[in-house]
């Protein structure tokens, strides 16, 4: 019984670790989806001609309207600048995410934001966003399955099924997340090359949301591996106990699905009591591992109760004989 409790505690620990990793992955992926820091960089914008926002490099020269000398009565001021090459441009910071793209403004402090979906090519507009949303949805389903297994399930067979579904959902979520991240990178590169000319970045790099998304993918796959490990361990433990029963009773090899089945009807009654404590076990063969684990757990509980009653009987009988 102590061994069973240890195995149950070890399984609960693995389920808890898997749920924590899944919750961490879900939080990181949601934060990266809502962020506008996937890509950061600069935009090359022409400076206004000797405007107020230009720091310096402009000087005034008086010129006459009739083309004469500068000391005539009719004059105007002409502004000249000696800036050439990249000095004629301002490099403004920008950041872009799946929802918004924000650019620093030259006229006043602050930034101007617009929807990134409106900037992308129509053929690739919703593909990456849909994959990212499905990735988060599968993670949420996996987390709910693991949480149900951890908090509400005391049946080993039901817990085994929940672990299997959670593991499959986590693997699908991780693969879909990897595809979604790669798709968005391609969408951004296509937008940088084919998007509006007033938006195209001069240089760009990956932001913190990009790395957060890949950390989320790593946590998701780690949770999937932990859940699969837990599921495989439970199945192998059951098969090991099943094979030990074959060694104990070789006659069971012909019909191995009935090895754990007791007689069809067993009753424990006492004088003056109705036949209410009879236990009826199924006589049909076991068709799945989860059914076998359910039956094995029930038999273990029954054997434990019978062992306790036998020990009490051994303790009570000597005391009764001494009193006689």
From Swiss-Prot:
Q: What does this chain do?
A: May cause the redistribution of PAPOLB from the cytosol to the endoplasmic reticulum.
Q: GO CC: one term?
A: endoplasmic reticulum membrane
- Show the Pfam families listed in the entry: GSG-1 (PF07803)
For this UniProt record, the keywords arranged alphabetically read as follows: Endoplasmic reticulum, Membrane, Transmembrane, Transmembrane helix
Name of the molecule in the record = Germ cell-specific gene 1 protein
- What organism is recorded for this protein? Mus musculus (Mouse)
Gene name on record? Gsg1
Query: Topology relative to the membrane, per the entry?
Result: Multi-pass membrane protein
Tissues expressing this chain: Expressed in spermatogenic cells (at protein level). Expressed in germ cells within the testis from day 21 onwards.
Q: Which GO terms describe its molecular function?
A: RNA polymerase binding
